[in-house]
Amino acid sequence: MREKRALLLLTALSLVLTLLAGCGNTAPDTGEKTMVIGDTTFNSENWEETVDPHRTYNGWACIRYGIGETLVRYTDSMELEPWLARSWSNDGDRTWTIVLQDNVTFSSGRKMDAAAVKQCLEHLLENHDRAPGDTKIADMQAEGQTLTIVTSQPNPALMNYLGDPYGCIIDVDASDFEKGIVAGTGPYVVQELVTDD
């Protein structure tokens, strides 16, 4: 009985010492930070033929790869917050006024203003199967950094839909849709898109 207790105590002590030894930090903290810059490869079996957010569900790739951003985004608590839009308001019916962030440029170098966003949303409505029915956009007017959208019927969820990945704002003029490459406002630029690699 005494031997069992001694063995149990010795085993417990060994476990505690092993745990404490594993928690130690032998490397000194130099305060230096390392930044590695290079190619970023994501999804080693890439099935996306394009990162054009206005084609099928490729808006997810556009955001995931850091190429594009939307006018609004969702917080962790699923509330809308500004991203490329600075603010927005609705007259309670069909007219929305969206004020855009200043000093945002596309990877092409073009300034993101209301005219560029209007052109982008027109391209979205012409090419995406869900966007026209979701957004119900009937008309848009652009002036400086202010975009006015009129919907065909009241649509209180308009900003939610513009936060969908298909709503990534891209420079339509600088995008190469044949190669599947778009110019967005995100921190990364597409150089080449290789599918099924």
Residue ranges and their predicted role:
Residues L15, I37, L71, S87-W88, ...:
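Residue-level signal for nonpolar/aromatic packing positions in well-ordered secondary structure
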Residues C62, G66, E79, W83, ...:
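Extracytoplasmic/secreted proteins, especially bacterial periplasmic and envelope-associated proteins
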Residues S89, P132-E178, G186-V194:
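Surface-exposed binding/hinge segments that line
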Residues G31-N43, T95-V99, V117-C120, L147-I149, ...:
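Short, well-ordered beta-strand elements
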Residues M1-M35, E49, E79, H123, ...:
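Short, low-complexity disordered leader/linker segments with a strong preference
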Residues R86-H128:
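Aromatic- and charge-enriched surface segment that lines or borders ligand/interaction sites
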Residues G38-D91, A183-T185:
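N-terminal lobe/hinge region of extracytoplasmic solute-binding protein
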Residues T30-E32, G66, W83-A85, D91-D93, ...:
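Extracytoplasmic
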